[in-house]
Amino acid sequence: NVSAEKLHGDIKSNVGALMSGIQQGGVVEIKKTTQLAGLVVDSVVRNPDAFSWLSRIRDKDEFTYGHIVRSAVWAGVFGRHIGLDKKDMNMLVSGVLLKDIGKVKLPESLLTLDEKSRSPEQEAEYRCYVNYGVDTLKATSGVPAEVIHIVKNHCERFDGSGYPQGLIGDKIPFLAKVAGIVTTYDAVTN
């Protein structure tokens, strides 16, 4: 029985190790990520309130790490709320844990700018992180296609205003829509 606080710490350290490994040219440890996703789902199923409130605590760490952790928790909570089965919840949480791995290939100066401060050229370069992440996952054996679809499409928006493809409505995979909702929710509330 893993406490929510310990699990939150485990996720945070795993995300840090994941990003560091990719930065150093390593591969994604999909087995470890999948295990953590399963623990998040189990924790949310057992006690959704404790885990979701814990995720609201502002981390003093770099924003991306905190955002990934909080978004993964919200993915589990929201997935449970809308009645996803355990397999889909695991895919959703895994995808959210991995959604930003492509950012390690962007210059740090670009990551410190908020969306409104970026020039059109900088915004175009920033948006490449999605494809960088997809390429990294495709080069890693054992990553489920559903997880790759979530990473690839989590920035798409129902009205077609998202990226990288500008997909509209039902062209966006369902779990990617859910990932987009929870990551936007976390970004707006933090």
PLM ranges: what are they?
Residues 11-190:
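Histidine- and acidic-residue-rich, metal-dependent catalytic cores
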Residues 2-8:
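Extended, charge-enriched "interface" segments that sit outside catalytic cores
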